[in-house]
Regions:
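Generic detector of ordered secondary-structure context
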Residues: 1, 63, 284, 331, ...
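Conserved P-loop NTPase motor core
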Residues: 1-564, 613-614, 630, 635
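Generic detector of short, well-ordered, non-transmembrane alpha-helical segments enriched
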Residues: 5, 379, 432, 480, ...
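Active-site-adjacent structural elements in folded domains
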Residues: 112, 420, 824-826, 834
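Compositionally biased, intrinsically disordered low-complexity regions used as flexible
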Residues: 180, 819, 835-836
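Short Cys/His-rich zinc-binding micro-motifs
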Residues: 829-848, 852
Length: 853
């Protein structure tokens, strides 16, 4: 009550922000008449003028009003479109690195030209991120006319773009592309062997279109680049043939809430009998157990025409948020192979991860990040806590007059669809257009059959028809149009009302099921009533819908009984709508916890990735790989002497034999103890044990190792030797990183079991992950030095081919959506790291100069 009164007099934070930004709008409007008088050449010259002012110390905020006024005028001359005041407000929000929520049809695409132009003046590049190639192409060509008119370069990246064109695109002032392409380019760059091969430059400023879809809906599935593993696919066929003998509830359990499936004790016993295995959990049978678990998931959780389709003999994933086919993408960890076995198509080899990153961690690397969408306010807390992004709701240019009717709910799905068909029929008779939203291909095709039976002409837009997506959705507002669309397929394309449609009430939205997220439902509703148009929406639900069955039945079923529901009769009551909304809030909170928890796990990998990639860049950028190599040698010697030359014992008792074995194996350097008093290095350098300590021994060994390496360099072209050093260190690093990723996957897979031992799984994951990482960093040094000290570099012409980075046969795909245990925040255990390694704290300093002091 008190807060309501305060808000009434002071306004919300959103109100205060809009009021503050209004001063920018007034400044832009004040310049409009002056800018209009400029000739085309004078308007174009403003770009050079702005760049000069920035070079002389002006800030972007200082030139913002004039730059926005220039873009507004350029847009009028080139596109015939003038930015509304609300679009200027949205432009300022984006420029300040926040999220602008603007209702559908308010002109987000045009709004983005304002901050894009302003920030592109710095010469550091601006990335405009879209959800699909169609929108990237459309916007780069459409809005690109404004940028090009003002003298800025525009680029676009897509999946099959040639490498030289991709690199050129990244040097453009403004670059359009999909979230997947930007993420994969980052991963690919960190697998390259020279700066010349890399395409991305510093990640400066990004504006993410449909930001909720990219940063929230897709946050749980990582981008993965993988190479083929060598495991046989036969086990998937073998196990798949046994699955039909399992009975649900008796032999395996499915938890739809947690999206997991697992064998029961009875199921394990049956499988051991069928496979003729004594103990399924014996380490020797771990691969069989893994295949079995994935097969149970494939049969128990994943449905054809809902989660995937079979097209041209391949299992193709359906994006659960957009309803689009994700050709070329594969589930990881053997799940895709299990689905291929289930559907009886050819099983492709399992992939092993070479590089991966989540969108959460990729987009947090930009110096500045902004986003725009029609629906973000419901997820404001998540944007704030994970991305440090504030959501500002931008007012509409025209008042919203769409009528959102209460939900109607039926007992069964059949009753629901029958009633929906009846309403579509009534509206179709008066030629009023209807957009019908479904949540899966299966449902859209079921509804399509019913409409055909009723003789109603209609269009279907789902993953199977995505090629005609823009055309189908753009016609959805024409007289008599009935369009069935899965989820938000067609998002980003305007639905323009045909002649006479506003008089009929505008476009009617008919939702056939509530989505887990209120935001997705709001997106569907938002297709109607754009820019002050008339429109209406209504959702038809049944107690058999997944959302109500899984999350809301305990509250809604008794409510229905209390309201006296009869077969075939719907209930339309605010109490029902409220109960449905509460079920959605419950799911949203559950999914937020999962994403937040997954981020805590991924942050462990992210810290390691940052350190590893920093070392990789250091090797690539150095002009003298020999220095890094000798630093590595110094670390290897230091680690060895810490064990062998213990200062707590007399030098005469040091295990020189073990030290000699290591030096000969690692560096081809010899040390011996000819008598009780002396050490002899390389047969010439003499050390008296009586006056020796670990530091002196370290120094002498390092001198001998350096000389041995310099002797190897004699007669070899210096530049070629430096090239060989780089390539070998990078090859060793990449091979060990690949193995480390596999080890981390295995660790993550089994870490949940630590909870049974009263240990926190996240704490254990951090600790053991750090141990694995420390061991990998030590092995990088050991293997790099051993290889380079022993390799014979005789004839550079013969060896040139061997030391050229070759393109790898890799697959790019999205990972699986996983769930993990509830988190407990914990400080990481610091373990031993080499003195010259980058500090795992992320400071970018060497460990010895940071936390290793």
């Amino acid at each position: 009550m008190v807060f309501d009164l305060i808000r009434k007099f002071v306004g919300t934070r959103n109100d205060r922000e809009i009021k503050r930004i209004q001063s920018y709008v007034d400044a832009v409007n004040a310049l409009e008449d002056e800018i209009k008088t400029l000739s085309d050449d004078q308007l174009i010259a403003k770009t050079s003028d702005f760049k000069g002012r920035l070079a002389n110390g002006s800030t972007l905020n200082e030139i913002l009003p004039e730059a926005f006024a220039v873009v507004r005028e350029a847009s009028m001359r080139v596109l015939g479109m003038r930015h509304f005041d609300v679009q200027i407000i949205g432009g300022v929000v984006l420029h300040e690195g926040k999220i602008a929520e603007m209702k559908t049809g308010e002109g987000k695409t045009l709004m983005a030209t304002l901050p894009v132009y302003l920030n592109a003046l710095t010469g550091k590049g601006v990335h405009v991120v879209t959800v699909n190639d169609y929108l990237a192409t459309r916007d780069s060509e459409w809005m690109g006319k404004v940028y090009k008119f003002l003298g800025l370069s525009v680029g676009m990246i897509y999946h099959d773009i040639p490498e030289d064109e991709r690199k050129a695109a990244y040097s453009a002032d403004v670059l359009y592309g999909t979230n997947n392409e930007f993420g994969f380019d980052f991963l690919r760059d960190n697998m390259k062997f020279s700066n010349d091969q890399m395409v991305q430059r510093e990640l400066n400023f990004s504006i993410v279109d449909e930001v909720d879809s990219i940063l929230i809906d897709e946050a749980r599935t990582p981008l993965i680049i993988s190479g083929q593993a060598e495991e046989s696919t036969d086990k998937y066929y073998q196990v798949n043939q046994l699955i039909p003998q399992l009975k649900k509830e008796q032999h395996y359990l499915v938890d739809e809430k947690a999206k997991s499936a697992a064998l029961t004790d009875e199921g394990i016993v049956l499988m051991e009998k069928l496979l003729n295995i004594e103990n399924l959990y014996d380490p020797a049978n771990i691969e069989t157990l893994h295949c079995l678990n994935q097969a149970v998931k494939a049969h128990g959780l994943f449905k054809n025409e809902v989660d995937y389709v079979v097209k041209d003999g391949e299992v193709v994933i359906i994006d659960e948020f957009t309803g689009r086919m994700m050709s070329g993408r594969r589930y990881s960890d053997g799940l895709h192979q299990a689905l291929e076995a289930k559907e009886g198509v050819k099983i492709e080899n399992e992939n092993q991860t070479l590089a991966s990153i989540t969108f959460q961690n990729y987009f947090r690397m930009y110096n500045k990040l902004g986003g725009m969408t029609g629906t973000a306010d419901t997820e404001a807390e998540e944007f704030s806590s994970i991305y440090k992004l504030e959501v500002i709701v931008v007012p509409t240019n025209q008042p919203m007059i769409r009528e959102d009717c209460p939900d109607v709910i039926f007992r069964t799905e059949k009753e629901k669809f029958d009633a929906a068909i009846e309403e579509i029929k009534e509206l179709n008779e008066i030629k009023r257009p209807v957009l019908v939203g479904t949540i899966s291909i299966e449902r859209s095709e079921l509804l399509s059959k019913k409409l055909k039976k009723a003789g109603i002409k209609h269009s279907v837009l789902n993953a199977k028809h995505h090629e005609q997506e823009a055309e189908i959705i753009s016609q959805a507002g024409q007289p008599g149009a009935v369009t069935i669309a899965t989820n938000m397929a067609g998002r980003g394309t305007d639905i323009v009302l045909g002649e006479g449609i506003p008089e009929l009430g505008g476009l009617h939205i008919l939702g056939t099921e509530r989505h887990e997220s209120r935001r997705i439902d709001n997106q569907l509703r938002g297709r109607s009533g754009r820019q002050g148009d008339k429109g209406s929406s209504r959702f038809y639900l049944s107690l058999e819908d997944d959302l109500l069955r899984i999350f809301g039945s305990d509250k809604i079923s008794p409510l229905m009984a209390r309201l006296g529901m009869e077969d075939g009769q719907p209930i339309e009551h605010t109490m029902v709508s409220k109960a449905v909304a509460n079920a959605q809030k419950k799911v949203e909170a559950h999914n937020f916890d999962i994403r937040k928890h997954l981020l805590e796990y991924d942050d462990v990998m992210n810290r390691q990735r940052e350190v590893l990639y920093a070392l990789r860049r250091e090797i690539i950028n150095t002009e003298n790989g020999k220095e890094i190599l000798l630093d590595m040698a110094d670390e290897v010697i230091d680690d060895a002497l810490a064990d062998i030359a213990d200062e707590k014992i007399y030098p005469e008792e040091w295990d020189i034999e073990s030290l000699n074995e290591l030096l000969e194996r690692q560096f081809a350097v010899h040390i011996e103890k000819p008598n009780d008093n002396d050490l002899l290095l390389q047969g010439s350098t003499k050390l008296e044990l009586e006056h020796c300590n670990r530091e002196k021994l370290h120094g002498a060994v390092m001198v001998a190792v350096t000389r041995a390496y310099e002797a190897k360099e004699v007669g070899v072209n210096t530049d070629f030797m430096r090239h060989v050093e780089k390539v070998i260190m990078l090859q060793v690093l990449d091979a060990l990183w690949k193995d480390h990723l596999l080890g981390m996957d295995h660790l993550k897979e089994g870490i949940g079991l630590r909870g049974y031992a009263q240990k926190n799984p996240l704490t254990e994951y951090k600790k053991e992950g750090f141990d694995l990482f420390s061991n990998m960093m030590a092995r990088i040094k050991e293997e790099s030095t051993e290889y380079l000290f022993k390799v014979q570099v005789n004839n550079e012409v013969e060896m040139a081919d061997e030391f050229v980075s070759k393109p790898q046969n890799v697959v790019e795909h999205r990972g699986n959506t996983n769930t993990l245990e509830k988190p407990v925040t914990i400080r990481r255990d610091e373990d031993k790291v080499g003195r010259n390694d980058p500090c795992p704290c992320g400071s970018s300093k060497k460990y010895k100069k940071c936390h290793g002091k």
